[in-house]
Structure formats: structure tokens, C-alpha cells
Amino acid sequence: MPVGVEARASWRVVALTLLLLPAVPAASQPLPPRPLQPSMPHVCAEQKLTLVGHRQPCVQAFSRVVPVWRSGCGQQAWCVGQERRTVYYMSYRQVYATEARTVFRCCPGWSQKPGQEGCLSDVDECANANGGCEGPCCNTVGGFYCRCPPGYQLQGDGKTCQDVDECRSHNGGCQHRCVNTPGSYLCECKPGFRLHTDGRTCLAISSCTLGNGGCQHQCVQLTVTQHRCQCRPQYQLQEDGRRCVRRSPCADGNGGCMHTCQELRGLAHCGCHPGYQLAADRKACEDVDECALGLAQCAHGCLNTQGSFKCVCHAGYELGADGRQCYRIEMEIVNSCEAGNGGCSHGCSHTSTGPLCTCPRGYELDEDQKTCIDIDDCANSPCCQQVCANTPGGYECSCFAGYRLNTDGCGCEDVDECASGHSGCEHHCSNLAGSFQCFCEAGYRLDEDRRGCTPLEESVVDLDGQLPFVRPLPHIAVLGDELPQLFQDDYGAEEEAVAELRGEHTLTEKFVCLDHSFGHDCSLTCDDCRNGGTCFPGLDGCDCPEGWTGIICNETCPPDTFGKNCSSPCICQNGGTCDPVSGACRCPPGVSGAHCEDGCPKGFYGKHCRKKCHCANRGRCHRLYGACLCDPGLYGRFCHLACPPWAFGPGCSEDCLCEQSHTRSCNSKDGSCSCKAGFQGERCEAECEPGSFGPGCRNRCTCRPGVACDPVSGECRTQCPPGYQGEDCGQECPVGTFGVNCSGSCSCVGAPCHRVTGECLCPPGKTGEDCGADCPEGRWGLGCQEICPACEHGASCDPETGTCLCLPGFVGSRCQDACPAGWFGTGCQMRCACANDGHCHPATGRCSCAPGWTGLSCQRACDSGHWGPDCIHPCNCSAGHGNCDAVSGLCLCEAGYEGPQCEQWCRQGYFGPGCEQKCRCEHGATCDHVSGACTCPAGWRGSFCEHACPAGFFGLDCGSACNCSAGAPCDAVTGSCICPAGRWGPHCAQTCPPLTFGLNCSQICTCFNGASCDPVLGQCHCAPGWMGPTCLQACPAGLYGKNCQHSCLCRNGGSCDPILGQCTCPEGWTGLACENECLPGHHGAGCRLNCSCLNGGTCDRLTGHCRCPAGWTGDKCQSPCVSGMFGVHCEEHCACRKGATCHHVTGACLCPPGWRGSHCEQACPRGWFGEACAQRCHCPPGASCHHVSGECHCPPGFTGPGCEQACQPGTFGKDCEHPCQCPGETWACHPASGACVCAAGYHGTDCQQRCPSGRYGPGCEQICKCLNGGTCDPATGACYCPAGFLGADCSLACPQGRFGPSCAHVCTCGQGAACDPVSGTCICPPGKTGGHCERGCPQDRFGKGCEHKCACRNGGLCHATNGSCSCPLGWMGPHCEHACPAGRYGAACLLECSCQNNGSCEPTSGACLCGPGFYGQACEDTCPAGFHGSGCQRVCECQQGAPCDPVSGRCLCPAGFRGQFCERGCKPGFFGDGCLQQCNSPTGVPCDPISGLCLCPPGRAGTTCDLDCRRGRFGPGCALRCDCGGGADCDPISGQCHCVDSYTGPTCREVPTQLSSIRPAPQHSSSKAMKH
């Protein structure tokens, strides 16, 4: 080893020793920890790399030319020549390499303290930055771990905590909505529900408590989840069932009116039918006594009736046809109208004074009282609303275009052309008053016909090719109802019925009208027929058209008839009325159908049964008005009004029976009468008895005997002549009294008596001396001389009027008809008050309630526990866990119960109302049959007991903590510790004994080679250098240390020690990590062997083999190249001819004697021979000199100046003078001897055989060297290549693009395609096809030969080469099978959408589809004010200028307003946004609904109105300044000035005249007073 190398090696050893030696501790310091060794506990080995620099030798060389002596220099034996010499020398370079060394450190989680044998102290990793844990950090012996608080779970990094979304599992156990929160969750309920005590179940709450149930006025709770809206008095509910509008005062109980009600300026004004007049209360109607007022004009007697009167005649007389005159029966009547119609132009009536001319309706008598002239009815304010046309004898109403005549014949109503479908509008129709208007959708315009619509972009084409013209606007057509076919009955029968109904009486002598007149007084002619009526053929009456009746067709059909002569009966039901012409039914609100057969269902009313009513206790509402049916004595929208005067009972539908003139008031509940002074009796019908007076006749008179007292005041009367009374005796005795002082009482049983004698004057219907007896059965009238009609249904004849007195429940002239539905009582005048489908008795009106209802008016729903009609059946839900259906009686069980009588809990696994909800409890938990709440068994928790107890807890509700060591879990039910593998003992406090492991330490360890056993899993902890389950395997190559976990640092194929990791280097390498190559001259393992190469050969550092320089060979490079070879590895062949050898190094030819040239191919020049042609010939002139030997003649077979040329074929011998004698071309002669031998390419005894394939040359001894199927010339060995190849030995394939013999043809294949070098056939690449690969694959094919089918979907394009899919816009995936995910669009979904405000983008173009409330290219704009919804198309309906939410349209009310549309102000006492803030004002003081400031009343001020106005201020809030002069103060409330110092006037600035000269007093005292 050279000295330098040895020195460097020694230095490295010293350096390594210094590194390994521990520092010597000072005597004053404590001993440091002992150096760590691999055998110490918790010590881990590590590899540490260091960078080491050293000098590396390298061999260099240079060349130079030096003079050398050479021998054989021609004439001289030696001469000096030039020779190139190479000099080799050694140099050094500085190189750096990394060296690895093993160091020992404490394993992670351990540390070494002074004096410890190894690493025995645990490191508390949690003390430093909490160990990196996000949650709690738990230190363990030799390590640590992170935990998370409840509601969080540990992430994969073992440190980060992530919130657990409990709502993802079973909705968190929540019945309605689960809301996740950090570390926990909570349950929420839908509107109308509240959270149960279990925190999960939702219970229904009163729906009225949420926003007043949406009601504008009042919310009435019906059930827990149902309510109805109710309006304040004078308001009615709209169709939406929430808002209220002011209702007509006539809508409630007919406005309190007995007969008719008319609304004027918001107030109800009552009216009465003919024959009645308003009572003093301006509501009730009382009969007009036409007899008493002299309006009857009866000839004999007058009998007053309800609403009318009737004339009666004395005995022996009979009532005339006019109903007033009386005629003796035996008197012959002379008809004054018989001659010339009495001179009348129209009607003539015979009277006792002569003919009386009358005119038909629409005419009036002229001044001659004979002639009838037409009345211009249109000039006298007719009922026509729009157009009036006067006609002879009448007038006709009509309407403008677009209107049609109402059924009353007067009013006009607009024709809704749009609703009838006759508008002809193509798109939209808008009805106008009297007309309509068509309009088109966006993007269209109205055609010239004003009906059709044409797109804006379309041009108008003149279809008929004529000039354009302007079309007039269409006239608006009035649509009339089509008249059905009319029915015609026998007119005679109808006339008889009419006559019977009129009750006319004819004389015994029947007379016949003459001169084509008719009527009861023969005063009518055919000219009197009205309303289109025509005369009968006999000219004896009018034939009326449809809808008219009467003797001259001047009366519309009665309500229950229609058609011609009113002969067809109406078939309208439920109170519907029929058109008198067509018979079409007009249904009242709440009823529908062609015949009004469809009434409104319960809870609805109105014309189309669309209005919703909400009556208390499920009460039924009036089908017309929606009003609730009230208890007796009450009426009105909310039954809050007392009955009007003289009405009582349910719905105030019964009339009081009191004598109103004698009565103070009538009880509204039971109809009892309170009498005025002077009257008594149940109906106050009787005056006080003589000797009593006053209210109820309870006071006794104090007059002397024989003197009567006033029954009202009790005053005593004076003595008057019989039949008279009064202070001046000018008054006749009142009815019922007679005699002196009218003291006698008539004993005429209510009939009047003669005022003087007391003789009874019996009224009609009475007879006898005291008029106490009624007329005999079948007789009536004065003197009981009239015969009663045939009354039906047990009715009797009124002895006074002769009318049939119908029993309650019947009506009609003969009581032949039962009361119509909804009416009862005497005369069917009382309206039934039965609600909710109840039926009333036609006589008594008593309600028979439908199932589920009870009460006098069936307005009260069945009480709990009863059901059926009138609620008479008791419920049989005896278990007490339910009620029964009020209609069917079926038990409606409470939540959690079922069975016919609700006696059973829900079957196992079900709960709730109807036991229809399925329990979701798990792990054997019991389910509450009412709420579904789970009661978990021990060891389980959660809403559905789906979670086991968390680690460390057990028992019921997991409320007990486990007492187990080492983090061992415990049994969730019993709490007993379940020791993990490796632990044992009652509390798992002990680790397994040595050589045992697993659960209960029951398994035996199987570890070898000094390994220890893991007490938990039994895994072997191998000693360094070993691995495997049982530590039987040594570390594999490249690994070392404990568990073979360290990677060796050995390089260049070096192997390391499996325990310590030290490197063992392979041949050719050295160093700590085998990173250094062997130095020159050294080789083998560790470079310890020396090389012995000669002749400049170099040594291989791995094998030691010599790498020889050019020209040398052998193990040690000791031998030159063999003859004919030269160069590196002696692999090059010499190119020398004539048997010359070449230089073994350079390859230069060493020519034999006689030859020269670079390849020794030339003979010596003439005159020269021998080696290097250096010798001159000495032959005679002209003689040849042999170029080798110098002889002066050529040897046989050669010729030429230098004998260098062989004999020509066919010659031989010396100087080639002899001709060959060999037969044929297959023979050749030897050039020297002439012997015949086979020619090149032939062989055999007769030289006739060609050389076999693969051989050539003389005797076929040479082997052909042609490749790739090439053939060789049998004579010369030249190769003939097949198609596709070329070259001397056919070793080269045709270059690309060529083919065929000698590669002469050019390929014609397409780009990228190859062609067969032999045939030129095109070999197509994948994706191409065709003879020249000129075509691509079809669209659905790909690959080589287009053999494979594409799998692209959704219009994707397939790559023809490899089948990969190119997806269209909006699709992605290997096969374009996935649409772009949300937020992406375009090609391969690579573009990111730019839509804002949660707008979604169209996956193809990226166009934004905006959600409700936004618009714009990127949905960046919020809907403009007043619009909301999708596309901002919906208009906000907010009032008070309030904006609306652009998304939902919800009105954002300003301060001071509330309601769905901000239509309501704050309730008194509330203010601010949403009217949620309560005013801080005293009771009765309102506050500003916006600011909440108190609105102080006049005279008060301050924030709470607790201060009086300061002087000089008055009014509300003391905001006004007083305007008082003369030092006067003003009233703080009204501002009125209180004058002082004689000042007067409204502002105290006027001085009286008498004081004007008096000088006013100085004002300083007043100033002092003011100042004081």
C-alpha cells in the first residue's frame, strides 16, 4: 500500500475512534447517562449518514513521437525512424461520499434519566401542545392517544375531531325535524306542534296561538289542530275563510225588519208589504185597519183582515162583483153597460149611478171620462235601468249592447262574453262593462279582427291577393237564453182554478157579456190584452204568451208556475225560483243543479258552495248568508244581538202574540207580554176590570160608588147621559161599555153593544143574544149567512172571514198544501231554526236533529259520551280512553289505544293515533303506546335504543360508570369488566404473565431467537436481525435491526449485517456504504486483491480480469493477436491479400515478399522483388523478374512483367503458353499443370452437378453466407436477395416506404400505415381501414381492423384508435354516462358555473337557471320591488307600500302594520315591527303604532302621559300653543281661554266699551306673580 493511502486510512480510524469514545465527565458534574446499547430496554437503532471527503487516484496518459532505431532499412542494417509512444501517469482528485453509521436513541415515548440502564422514563407527550390533539390527550406508558368529547369522533390522523351528525341515523330519533349542532343535536317540531318532555316526540298545540290562526279578526279553536275564523259584528267572512268584510245590515236577520229590508248609506231601513205599515219601532209591520181608516169604502160592513180587508153585506144582500157594493138578491139588475158599452171605449162597469168607464193597465181616461188614452209610462220614472220603449198600454225595458235584461224585467246585467265562450279571443279575454276585449300573450300582437293573435316576427300576408282593407270592430252580441219547448194545458181548467182562488160570487141570475167584451164587469175587450197576449177565437178573452197570466195577461206567472198560460208547474227545489218564461231554475246561494237539487255541504255556503263558514260547535250555517243559527232570543252574525221588538224564539223567527197597542214589551226568549197601564191578560188583550187601573191593573180605584175610574190613571169620571162620557160628555162610550158614564159592561163576549141600551151588535161569525156563540159549522159572516168553502186537513172555517183556518203545518186557500221545507206553524209563516241538516215538525217547528247534533235548533254538537240523532245514544267506549263519533257512534280512541271500546293498548310494535305508527325501538326496547317513546333496556340508549352504552358506562340509561383499569370496557348491562387481551383480574389491572397472551391470558407464546411476546395479540417482538410471526426468519437482504425495520445503506450491491447493519461490500467496491470503487491495481471483495496485467492492460475491479489494449490478448494481456486479427479484443479481421499478415495493434498489412499496397494487393513494380519490393531484379533486358524470388522467368501458371497475373482461362503452363484440354464449361484446367478439375460451382466425377444449395466455389467446398432466405451464386458465392431484403448478405430489410425485389417499389399506404416489405400489402394502424388505410373507422367502431364496438353514451364520440370517448357538452365519465355535477358545465364538465344566489346552470351552455327571487345572466340581481317568485313574474300583494320577500312573496310589513298583506294596523297596546312590542303607556292611552310613543290625550304630556300641560299649551300631547290674550290661561284640554281682568272674547283680547276709558293697571305685579 502506498504511504499516502496508509496515512489516510490511519487518519480515518483515529477519527472514528474519537467519534465513538464517550466524553470523560468532570469531577464536579453528575455522571451523565450511560451510553445506550441495543440490549438496553426501549433503545432503538438508527442509521446516521455523514459526508466524508478523500483523494481518489486516477490514471492519465499522453502521447509523443520519439526517434527509434529500426533494422532492415534496405542498404543499411539500422536506421533511425519515428515512433509514437504513450506515457501513463497517476494523478488524484478530491471526491466526497456519504457514510452511514449506527446510533442508538430512546424509542419514541421514552427518555433516559441519569443513572438509568436504558430508556426507562415515560415521556408525557400530552404536556407539549396537548400532543397535537384537538380534543383531550391521554398519556400512556410509552405513548399517548387522543380522544374526542361526546358528539365528536376521531379522524383518520388520530388527532383531529369531527362533529358526529346524529341526524343521519334514524333522524336522531326526532319525530319531525332533527337539527345537528356542534357536538350534539336537537329536535324541532312543525308549526302547530310542540316538543314533548322526551325531547323527541311532537304534540299538537292550539292552532290559534300561531299568528292568530291566519284570521283577520277572531280565531275560534275547534279541536287541538283545527280552528275557524270569525269576524267581528257587522262583518262577514270572505271566501278565503280568513279575511272579513263589512256586511250589509240587511244580511243579519233581515236587518231586524219584519217584512222587507233595504240598505241606505250603510243602515237598514225596513219596509212593509201592501196592507201593512211600520210600527213605532220602525222595524215591525202592523196591519193597516182599512175599515177603521175609511179606506175600504164598503157599502154595508167592513171586515179587516191581516194585510187587507173584506166587505160584507147585511142579510138579504149579496156582494157585487166589485167586492164593495151590496145588492138584494131578489132585485133585477139593469146593466147600464148593455147599450153601446155604456159609451166607454174600453171597460164598462155597471154601478148604481150608471156606467163607470175603466181603462186597461197602461191607459188613462180622457177628460170625457169615456175614452182611454195611452200613458207614456217611460216619462213617469219606470223601472227600466237603461232603455225604455213606450208601447200602447204599457212599456218595455231593454238593455244596451253587451247587457241582458234581468229576470225582474227592469235591471240590466253585464254579459260576460269571456265566461260564455262566445268572445272568439284566440289567447286571452278580459270582460268589460257591456263589452269585452281580447289581448295576446307576450310575443304576439292582435289581428285586425281584434280577436286573433299573430307572432310579432310573422308578416301579415294578404291571403286573397286583394288590396288591404280595414275591418270594422265586431259588434258585441247580447247572448240570450234559449227557450225550452213550452207546454200548454187546458185553458178552461186553469180559468176555473183562478176563479176559485179569487172566491168570486155571482148573482143567481147569471149574465153574459155582450159585444165581444169580457171580464167580471164586461169592461174588457181584446184591445186590453197586454204583454203580447192575443184574443181567443171567440174574442172572449186573452190568450197569454209564456210567462204571463191574468184576464188581460198583465200578471206574471205565480212563483210555482211558468210557460204558456202559466200552465207548467215549476220543479225547482230547495227554494229555487223558476223563470216565468222558460222555467229555468234560479237557485239561491248555497244550492246548485239544474233543479237546485244540490245544496251546499256542511260547512259551506254561497252561490257555488265555495264560501266556508265556521260556526261554533260545528253549527250549521245558513245556506244563503252563511250566518250561524242562534239560541232563542238572539240573532246576528255572531248571535250577539237581541231579537227586534215583537219577535222572539230561535232565530227571532216567531212573532209575539201580544196586543202591541196594549203592550210595553215582549220577552225575546219566550214571547211573554209586559202590559201597559190599563191592560191585563197573557196577551194584554183585556182592559182593567172596573175598580182597578194601572200597569197590570194592580191598583184599586178610590171613586165613589157609581163613578167609574180611568183604567190608566185611576182618575174618577163625571156623570154623563147614557152612552157618553168625558168632561163635556162629548165622547161616546168606548167599545164594550154602555149606559150612564159608560159604566155598563157589555156582555157580548167581545162583540160591541149599543152604547145606550147595551144590546149586542154581533160581528161577523158570531150569533146569539150575547154574541157568545160562533156561527154554526159550515156558516160564516154577518148573521152567519155565508157558506164555508171545503177546507182540508182538518182545517176549520173562520166564522168571521170565511177563510179556512189551517192547522199548524198547512197552508193554502183550502189548507190543501203542507208547509214547504224550512217553514212551519200557523200559516207556515215561521222559519225553521233547525241547523245541521235537522228537520223541523211542520206544525210545532220542533227540530229532529241529524246524527251528531242536539238542542232546540240542532246547533249544539253532541256532548262527550253521546251520539246519534238528537244525541240520544250513550257512547259505549267504556274504557275511558276515547270518545265516540257523534254521527256513527264508533269509538274514536285516544292516541295509544284501540279496540271496539278503546279498551286495548296498541298492539306490540305500534303506537299513536289509531295505532298506525310503527315503533322504531331496537334491541328489545319497549315502546310507549301513546307517544312511541322507547324505554331502553340496560346497556342501551338513544331515541330508538339504537346505541349501546358509550365506553365506560353501563346499566339503565347508561347511568353507571365502569370501574375497570387500562381502559377496559365493562358489560353494558351488569358492569362487569371485560378485560382486553393481555389483561386479567377483577378490574383488569394486571398484565399477562410472561409467555402468555390473549383473552384471560390463556394462550401460550411461540416466539424464538430471544424474542419477547406481546401480551395482547401474542405477536412476537423479534430481537434485532429477526422477523416473522415467530421470529424464525432472518432479516431479508436490505433490512436490518429490530423487526428488520431499518433499511440498509449499503450501495452498489453490498450486503449488510442483519443485526447492526454493517456493510459487506462486493467485488470492486469499498467504504462504509460500499460507495467507493477499487483503486487501480486492486480488485475483489473490499479491493483487497492486486492485479498483474501486462502490456498496458487494465484490471476489472470486480473480477480482476485484465482488459487488454488493442492488439493484445490473454489472461494477463501477455499475447499479441493471432495472425489475421488485430484491434481491441483482437476482434477485427485483417484485410490483407496474398497471404499477408497485419499488425496486431493497428491492423496495418505486413506484405510478404513480392507484394505491396495497403492490402498487399499489388505485385512489386517491374524491376523490383522481395520483401517490401526493396530488391532490384538482375534479369536481362526484356526478361520477366519474379516479384517474389527475383528469378528471371515466371513459374508455370503465371505471366506478366512481374509474373503477377494468373493464366487466362483455357491456358496453363509456363508463360501460359499451353491450351487446356478439358471438356465443356463445367471443367477448368489447373493453370500450372493443366490437369482438368471441376469449374467453380460444379462437382462430381464428371463435374456435371451443380453445387447443392448453401455451397459454392471450386469443389463446392465454400458455405454460402446469405441471410433471410437469400440464395448464393454457386460459382462466386454472391447473394441473390428475396423480395423485401437487400445487402451483400441480404441482412438488411427494405427501408420504410419500400418493398419488393431490391426494394425497388414505393409503398402507397396512407399516413401512419406500414406496408409489407415483401408484398407491399398495407398494414393499417388502429382506427384505419381500407386497401390503402385511407378510411377511418365507422362512428361506432374502433381499434385494429375496426373490430371493436364503441361504448360511448349520450351522443359521445368514440376515438377510432383506442375507443376512448369524447363527451358532448354537459356529460362526463369514461363512457359519457354521467351528467355534469352541480356547479360544472361544458366539455368534460371542466368549466365552473358562475351562477349566484343558488342558481343552477344549464350543463351544456352554462346558462343560469335562477331560483325564485332572482334574475340576471348570473342570477346576480334580486327581483325589483313589487315582484317576487320564479322569474320575478308574480306581483306582490302587500299594502301600505310594504315590500315583499323576493323569494316567497311574504310581505315585510313596516312598523305599525301586520297581517298577511300588511292590511291591518297594530292592535291597541302594540307597536313596531310585526306589532310585537307592547306599548309602555297607561291604561286607555294609545301609543303610536310605529314608534310606540304614547299618544297622550288632550291635557296630558310626557313619555307616559303622566304630566299636565305646562302653561300656554293644550291639546293632545300638549302640542298646541294657547292663543289667549289679556294674561288669560287656556283650558289644557280644549284650549278655551279663561279670561281675567274683564277681558272678553274667544281669545280674551276684547275690552268692554264701558271700560275702554279706564286705564289698565300696571303689569309689574302680574309679572311678579308670574315670576313667583
From Swiss-Prot:
Q: Which residues form the EMI domain?
A: 40-121
Q: Where is the signal peptide?
A: 1-26
- A Pfam family of this chain: FXa_inhibition
Protein keywords: Calcium, Disulfide bond, EGF-like domain, Glycoprotein, Repeat, Secreted, Signal
Q: Which InterPro entries match?
A: cEGF (IPR026823), EGF-like_Ca-bd_dom (IPR001881), EGF-like_CS (IPR013032), EGF-like_dom (IPR000742), EGF-type_Asp/Asn_hydroxyl_site (IPR000152), EGF_Ca-bd_CS (IPR018097), EGF_extracell (IPR013111), EMI_domain (IPR011489)
List S-S links within the chain. 44-107, 73-79, 106-119, 126-137, 133-146, 148-161, 167-178, 174-187, 189-202, 291-302, 298-311, 313-326, 418-429, 425-438, 440-453, 522-535, 529-542, 544-553, 566-578, 572-585, 587-596, 609-621, 615-628, 630-639, 788-797, 791-804, 806-815, 832-840, 834-847, 849-858, 871-884, 875-891, 893-902, 915-927, 921-934, 936-945, 1001-1013, 1007-1020, 1022-1031, 1044-1056, 1050-1063, 1065-1074, 1087-1099, 1093-1106, 1108-1117, 1134-1142, 1136-1149, 1151-1160, 1173-1185, 1177-1192, 1194-1203, 1260-1272, 1266-1279, 1281-1290, 1303-1315, 1309-1322, 1324-1333, 1346-1358, 1352-1365, 1367-1376, 1393-1401, 1395-1408, 1410-1419, 1432-1444, 1438-1451, 1453-1462
Location within or outside the cell? Secreted
One GO cellular component assignment for this chain's record is:
collagen-containing extracellular matrix
* Superkingdom of source: Eukaryota
All copies of domain EGF-like, residue ranges: 122-162, 163-203, 287-327, 414-454, 518-554, 562-597, 605-640, 785-816, 829-859, 867-903, 911-946, 997-1032, 1040-1075, 1083-1118, 1131-1161, 1169-1204, 1256-1291, 1299-1334, 1342-1377, 1390-1420, 1428-1463
Give GO MF terms, alphabetically: calcium ion binding; scavenger receptor activity
Q: What is its main location?
A: secreted
Glycosylation site list: 1000
Return the PANTHER family for the record: EGF-LIKE DOMAIN-CONTAINING PROTEIN, SCAVENGER RECEPTOR CLASS F
Name-wise, this protein is Multiple epidermal growth factor-like domains protein 6
